[in-house]
Amino acid sequence: MTESDTKITLIGSRLAREGLEFIFKGEMPECKKCRLKNTCLNLEPGRRYKVVRIKSNDIHECFLHDSGVLAVDVSRAPITTSVESRKAVQGAKIMYEPAKCGKRECAEYETCHPEGLIKGDKCKIVEVLESLDSKCEAGISLKKVKLAW
């Protein structure tokens, strides 16, 4: 899905606002009996999405969301992470590799291991943000980047 590609899905009416980013968690037991589940569950679990447009203000009943759900257009949301400094070139296409570091106590751990990306994802570097060299506890030369996947 490119930036201009969208999918229609349903989201809780209290959450439905343009610009909202969320990680799709997947099917819940309550979804099995819902007649709208195919629309709700057409996203990839564990991935980050962004609401780009509210399709209508018609509220649909939902077994999970007490205030119902609204139809929205979503696109894949860019994800901020780190890459090796030598690969951090705006416009470059890369295969995502999480940093080879297991230091969970590091202040940059979540940047280096973001939710929503999977090892091997084909991504494009849309923006190079900053050097993480002075922040990396493992001594790896890294740059913070924004990736489109």
From Swiss-Prot:
| Superkingdom classification of source | Archaea
Q: Which PANTHER family does its entry note?
A: UPF0179 PROTEIN MJ1627 (PTHR40699:SF1)
UniProt family annotation: Belongs to the UPF0179 family.
Q: What protein name applies here?
A: UPF0179 protein MM_0589
Report the source organism: Methanosarcina mazei (strain ATCC BAA-159 / DSM 3647 / Goe1 / Go1 / JCM 11833 / OCM 88)
What is the phylogenetic placement of the source species in the record? Archaea, Methanobacteriati, Methanobacteriota, Stenosarchaea group, Methanomicrobia
